[in-house]
Amino acid sequence: MRIEAATETTRELLDALTSLLAQLNPQLKPLTMERLARVIGDPATTLLVVRDDSRIVGAAAVLVYATPAFVKARIEDVVVDEHSRGKGVGEALVRRCLEVARERGAEIVELQSARWREVANRLYPRLGFELRESNLYRLNL
């Protein structure tokens, strides 16, 4: 297993992420090459992929940004292919996300996980995350 930052917009990456994101949320619109290029080109974002041999089996995005209060990191879209789950891929991926956040100067790291993702919700406290009481608001533009 190898975890690396995606630095090029390729058809292989697009196809792998499209498949992975559909497993994360089947209602998401398909990823486009333009959106993928925007993610990879965004200096605040590090897109990590997990390869098993040459196949991409997992991914996550780490966003680091500054506010007046903190330099924050958010871990987004953590997903491991259903055939690779239970092998420590997700834990290794999140640990690498935390390394990226530290390397980029983050003081705190936040992530959000759906309640039904039971395995993920057991993993995060083991890695030091604390469940927070919060009202999360969203507005689709």
Residue spans for each PLM region:
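A short beta-loop-alpha structural element at the N-terminal edge
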Residues: M1-L17
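Helix-loop element at the rim of GNAT/NAT acetyltransferase active sites that forms part
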Residues: T18-P30
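Active-site rim helix/loop that mediates acceptor-substrate recognition in acyltransferases
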Residues: L28-V49
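Conserved beta-strand in the GNAT
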Residues: V49, R55-V64, R74, V79
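A conserved beta-turn-beta hairpin within the catalytic core of GNAT-like acetyltransferases
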Residues: Y65-I75, R85, R132
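Conserved acetyl-CoA-binding loop-helix of GNAT-fold acetyltransferases
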Residues: V80, G86-E99, R122-R126
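Conserved active-site alpha-helix within GNAT-family acetyltransferase domains
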Residues: E91, E103, R115-E133, R138-L139
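Conserved GNAT acetyl-CoA-binding A-motif
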Residues: A101-S113
